[in-house]
Amino acid sequence: MRNQTLSAIEPRLMDWLKTLLHSILHLDEALPQWAAAYGPWIYGILFLIVFCETGLVVTPFLPGDSLLFAAGAVAATASDSLNVHLVVGLLIVAAILGDGVNYHIGAYLGDRVRNGNRFIKKEYLDRTHAFYEKYGAKTIIIARFVPIVRTFAPFVAGVGRMSYGKFLCYNVVGAIVWVVSLAYLGYALGNVPFVKKNFEIVILAIIILSILPAVFEIARGWLASRATVAEPKGES
């Protein structure tokens, strides 16, 4: 019975993932369609996506960097659909509130999730801890530009009981820098012919550039662990 249920769910899940991926890669098409379908509620949709991506550790897969860039680009090409300044203001608030909620969830759960659980992967927590070891409290700002780590940084700050006043300062600065830089970059480049013609490639490039720091950290950690394991063999 369980296998039959899983068999029925898997095709729907795959279809949903394909739809999500298509929407992320074609946000230049999706956002105007959402604006036409939902009117001013498009701002609420964008707010909710950014809030969930930053505020809930179970939704790190939602678009962040690419969404901000795309929203700015669409505002440049279709100002009747989106107002870039309103988008920037709302999404700064969404990012601040999201990180704040995430911090308090981490503080509430505390030691119960230090080693991960069925919903929170330990490798994500370890990766975020590594960022804190390297950058300290500035991780709250730097992590804004690193997918997955961005979602887990405020959570780990809460688990580690970082001073909320200190966290809030970094949270506000990070949210402003993140949203303003990416949304206005999209707005500045939105009417550039190359960007308009190759929007999917541009979004892919943003995603790849976003995850490169995490990839380098993982590779460095893997090489360091291999070197540690190999040392005793070399000595013998």
Language-model-detected regions and their locations in the chain:
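Transmembrane alpha-helical segments of integral membrane proteins
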Residues: 179-191
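Short, amphipathic, aromatic/basic-enriched membrane-interface segments that mark the entry/exit
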Residues: 35-36, 56-60, 140, 168-173
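Transmembrane alpha-helix interface/packing and boundary motifs in multi-pass membrane proteins
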Residues: 47-69, 210
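MFS transmembrane alpha-helix packing/gate-lining sites
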Residues: 94, 177-178
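Membrane-interfacial helix-loop-helix
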Residues: 9-47, 73-166, 191-206, 213-236
